[in-house]
Amino acid sequence: MDSFFSTYVLPAIIMIGQSLLLLVCLLVFIAYVLLADRKIWAAVQLRRGPNVVGPFGLFQSFADLLKFVFKEPIIPAGANKAVFLLAPLVTVLLALSTWAVVPLADGWVIANINVGILYIFAISSLEVYGIIMGGWASNSKYPFLGALRSAAQMVSYEVSIGFVIVTVLLCVGSLNLTDIVNAQHTGLGTVLGLPASFLDWHWLSLFPMFIVFFISALAETNRPPFDLPEAESELVAGFMVEYGSSPYMMFMLGEYAAVCLMCALTTILFLGGWLPPVDIWILNWVPGIIWFTLKACLVFFMFAMVKAFVPRYRYDQLMRLGWKVFLPLSLAMVIIVAFVLKLMGWA
């Protein structure tokens, strides 16, 4: 009995506790990411942004949460009720489940599987089904158009993201996210005879792929300037037109969870994860999760600045960029990286 408890029950209890802790921390982080998004946008427009609820508006997201929870959900008369309510739940559950394999520091991961990046890519690809379900079940033309746009957009840019992942796989030789970070201890800077630093991270040696991944991440998460599925000036609010109260909140939660995931992936694949900028003792003393969080926040700041400055693309421009620019570029980089690695004997 003791053997059964220590072998099966105790590890399950520990994993459930870790999952709940990660979920709570992630939800709080998303709340402040949403606030930061609104604050940065307001600052660019010379406004103050949310500043009433709590000091400097720090509790605004929690006030919005309570507002959505206590509002009455309204379901359109012609909607498919079951699918209409299931769609936001599918979206938010898929977005949150991807975080199970994301290492926040060395050893800080719930499931350290060998195909972590492939797992994230597969689960992220399924999120489009929640949007399609919501757009179709609403029985309205604007949500359906937004859902169709979202499906085409996410499929188009997943191809480029896939080639970026292949490039990183060629350089590292592993799909394990922890191995990808640890491989960035040495890189281009070390080859040039420099001490271990941020010059070893993949952002420099794979700079074109870093740009492709960053822009594709914007499109994959429906962020401006690629927010065509929910374009306010064209489709009112796209696939979320008919949603309100808790279902709308779940769609927004899933969207920002996906945004935070892309920031974390950018940090892991190209910015050294939890590694310090320079390998010296005083920076190594700082916990890795702090470096990881700071880098992810920097990437999100770039996301927010793009939203504030770059106008929305037309739909044909969006498709042309994905298929005629990013796809050939990413495919060419895969071939070039493979050739260079083979030429230098690193393959």
Swiss-Prot record:
Keywords of this protein's UniProt record, alphabetized? Cell inner membrane, Cell membrane, Membrane, NAD, Quinone, Translocase, Transmembrane, Transmembrane helix, Ubiquinone
Which transformation does this protein catalyse, written as a reaction?
a quinone + NADH + 5 H(+)(in) = a quinol + NAD(+) + 4 H(+)(out)
User: Could you tell me which PROSITE patterns the record lists for this protein?
Assistant: COMPLEX1_ND1_2
Query: Which Pfam families does its entry note?
Result: NADHdh
Q: Which GO terms describe its biological process?
A: aerobic respiration
- Say yes or no: keyword Repeat present: no
Membrane topology category: Multi-pass membrane protein
Chain's role: NDH-1 shuttles electrons from NADH, via FMN and iron-sulfur (Fe-S) centers, to quinones in the respiratory chain. The immediate electron acceptor for the enzyme in this species is believed to be ubiquinone. Couples the redox reaction to proton translocation (for every two electrons transferred, four hydrogen ions are translocated across the cytoplasmic membrane), and thus conserves the redox energy in a proton gradient. This subunit may bind ubiquinone.
Q: What is this protein called?
A: NADH-quinone oxidoreductase subunit H 1
Q: Which gene encodes it?
A: nuoH1
